[in-house]
Amino acid sequence: MTSREIVRRNLEFDNPERVAYNLFGYDPYRDFVNAGPGVQTKATPWQQVDENTWEKTDHYGNVWRRVEDHSAGEVIRGALQDIDDVYTYEFPDFSNPEDYAPVRKAREEHPDMWLNCGIPFTFTVSRKLFKLDVYLMQLVLNREKMRVLHDKVDKMAEDKIRNLAEAGADSVMIAEDWGTQDRLLINPETWRQ
């Protein structure tokens, strides 16, 4: 039974020979391979700006900073500086099938493994475009304009998902973190809206 079949049978509760797993860096113990599109419209690599500080711009235009050369960093300046920017901001174009060549290559190189592609979704993209504190404030103060932004992010995600599937992905993983250990970051009533 191939890794791809093991994962499929796990998902379908169809008597797999074992539990599917993914221990990164240990090829004999891995059923998954990961890949993503090659769109890098506004992205720059990390650049050292002083002795301990590094900065980069992601493909959305957000400026990131990190301490040392090994931390993940955080957004220090979102691409959107004003709420009305939601109407004019140009998202990276994830609709071009040619940008999904890395996914097709992964499928060709690993035909017997489960090809998983992770993408950021509404909250992850939106909170970085404004920075988290400003984003949460805009959810309360400018709900209709935030719906405009969320619809645009969702359209971009739809393009990604469609192209990932056409390029050979078996699954698309979306991880959103709307909460702390014991509660939502926003009022539950706002969440429902």
Show which residues each predicted segment covers.
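Active-site loop segments of alpha/beta catalytic cores
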Residues: 1-28, 66, 88-193
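Cofactor-binding catalytic cores of oxidoreductases
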Residues: 13, 23, 44, 58, ...
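Segments that shape or occlude catalytic/ligand-binding pockets
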Residues: 17, 23-45
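Short, solvent-exposed polar/charged micro-motifs at secondary-structure junctions
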Residues: 29-35, 51-53, 76, 125-128
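Short, low-complexity, polar/charged sequence segments that are solvent-exposed and flexible
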Residues: 38-44, 75-76, 83-85, 134-138, ...
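Short acidic, Pro/Gly- and aromatic-enriched capping/linker segments at domain boundaries
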Residues: 39-57
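Short, surface-exposed, low-complexity cationic segments
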Residues: 66-89
